[in-house]
A protein has these predicted regions:
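Conserved pre-motif I regulatory segment
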Residues: 1-26
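A basic/glycine-biased coupling hinge at the interface between accessory DNA-binding modules
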Residues: 17-18, 39-145
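Conserved lysine of the Walker
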Residues: 30-31
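Post-Walker A alpha-helix
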Residues: 34-35
Length: 145
């Protein structure tokens, strides 16, 4: 465990009695606490990496956490460890359960650029502002479902 940690951070890392919310401001060491806790659970507590999930909001944060954990656990297998974004976790679950829902697991998810292209193709020769308005109408319809 890193000597750079303060007492509350070390306490959070060693806490094992249930869920734990780490709430702190930017730059306060939340990512360090989470990555150190993952290493602690695997190395010191013998937890299987496949029983650990760290979910974050951005791809950048997920990549940083993956790199930090890899550095902390160098030489230790992390097979099955999940460190990803909420969106990536959602897609993973949907792909795993796609057949049960009657879909193929190799489905595509459209981003805003893909949607713009489809609306543009369907609308024909209209200006960009009209295409954006059509996208908003479609979005409102979807939200009303």
């Amino acid at each position: 465990m890193s000597a750079q940690l303060n007492a509350p951070q070390r306490e959070a890392i060693r806490y094992l009695d249930g869920p734990l919310l780490v709430l702190a401001g930017a730059g306060s060491g939340k990512t360090r606490v989470i990555t150190q806790k993952i290493a602690y659970l695997i190395q010191d507590c013998g937890m299987k990496p496949s029983n650990i999930a760290a979910i974050t909001f951005t791809n950048k944060a997920a990549k940083e956490m993956q790199e930090r954990v890899a550095n902390l656990l160098e030489g230790t297998s992390t097979s099955g460890l999940t460190i990803c974004t909420f969106h990536a976790l959602g897609v993973r679950i949907l792909r795993e359960e796609a057949k049960a829902l009657g879909y193929k697991p190799n489905f595509s998810i459209f981003d805003s650029t893909d949607c713009y292209g489809i609306v543009s193709d369907l609308a024909g020769s209209v200006d960009k502002a009209t295409i954006r308005k059509l996208q908003n109408v479609i979005s409102n319809w979807k939200n009303a479902l």
